[in-house]
């Protein structure tokens, strides 16, 4: 196990940047990567949660932790982050997402624009900016968090789901483009996860297939370097197969609406 951790640190270190780090899956990624000895750049909006997370990580692990509290939907702030960062970043984890809930006719256009900014524009920019050094060094990795909502149309979260489909397709294409350059790209196509956001919005807190964040992170890190996508949890893999391969599209969309109609 120790040699695997050392190999992971050598391949994806010395620094990892985690966008959307403050809680849930992002915090679980932070803990798992700290256990593997990577120094961390933590990015999220809420400074108090970031500071609390960083304090705990420093106390439990012999690593460096840098915090940046900023809005990942603000491209000026994101550009400033990249230009001011001089650490050797070997791994990018993009976990941040904006997901307003509501039928398209009821969602303000400003919210739709923010979905594009946070879920598409910023990860594109960060991948482009950070992968150049990874390619030059001949090693590195990118993890994009995606969602089962993006494998078919998802009423009530239609634009968010479309952005997650984009994330998956981008990761798959980049996986092929960059694998021979020793840069590993992976999309985690997750189902329901017990994050603070999910527990607030979901009507059914323990739906079949719901996972804890650390379970999602463990399966994702295990898949990095061996596959373009991973769907944590056997139930979720089965559901993905049924929804994407067996059911007619209209039926899959109706089933998805049954799952999303009670979101708040």
Indicate where each model-derived feature is located:
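Conserved glycine-rich cofactor-binding loop
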Residues: 15, 20-23
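Conserved glycine-rich Rossmann-like NAD(P)H-binding loop of the short-chain dehydrogenase/reductase
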Residues: 36-53
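Conserved NAD(P)H cofactor-binding loop of Rossmann-fold oxidoreductase domains
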Residues: 95-100
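Substrate-binding pocket helix/loop in short-chain dehydrogenase/reductase
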Residues: 103-104, 108-116
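Active-site helix of classical SDR
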Residues: 127, 163
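Residue(s) in the substrate-gating loop at a strand-loop-helix junction
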Residues: 147
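C-terminal helical subdomain
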Residues: 187, 203-241
């Amino acid at each position: 196990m120790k040699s695997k951790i050392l190999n992971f640190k050598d391949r994806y270190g010395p620094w990892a940047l985690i966008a959307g780090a403050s809680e849930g899956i992002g915090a679980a990624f932070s803990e798992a990567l700290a256990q593997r000895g990577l120094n961390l750049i933590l990015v999220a909006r809420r400074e108090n949660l970031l500071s609390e997370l960083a304090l705990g990580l420093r106390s439990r692990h012999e690593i460096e932790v840098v915090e940046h509290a900023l809005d990942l939907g603000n491209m000026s702030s994101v550009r400033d982050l990249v230009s001011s960062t001089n650490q050797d970043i070997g791994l990018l984890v993009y976990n941040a997402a904006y997901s307003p809930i509501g039928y398209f006719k009821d969602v303000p256009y400003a919210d739709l624009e923010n979905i594009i900014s946070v879920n598409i524009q910023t990860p594109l920019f960060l991948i482009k900016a950070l992968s150049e050094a990874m390619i030059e060094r001949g090693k590195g990795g990118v993890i994009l968090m995606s969602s089962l909502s993006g494998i078919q149309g998802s009423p009530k979260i239609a634009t968010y789901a479309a952005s997650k489909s984009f994330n998956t397709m981008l990761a798959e294409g980049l996986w092929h483009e960059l694998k021979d350059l020793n840069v590993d790209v992976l999309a985690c196509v997750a189902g329901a996860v017990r994050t603070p956001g999910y527990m607030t919005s979901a009507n059914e807190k323990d739906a079949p297939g719901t996972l804890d964040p650390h379970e999602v992170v463990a399966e994702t890190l295990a898949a990095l370097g061996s596959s373009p996508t991973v769907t944590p949890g056997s139930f979720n893999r089965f559901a993905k197969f049924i929804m994407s391969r067996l059911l007619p599209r209209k039926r899959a969309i109706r089933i998805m609406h049954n799952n999303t109609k009670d979101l708040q």
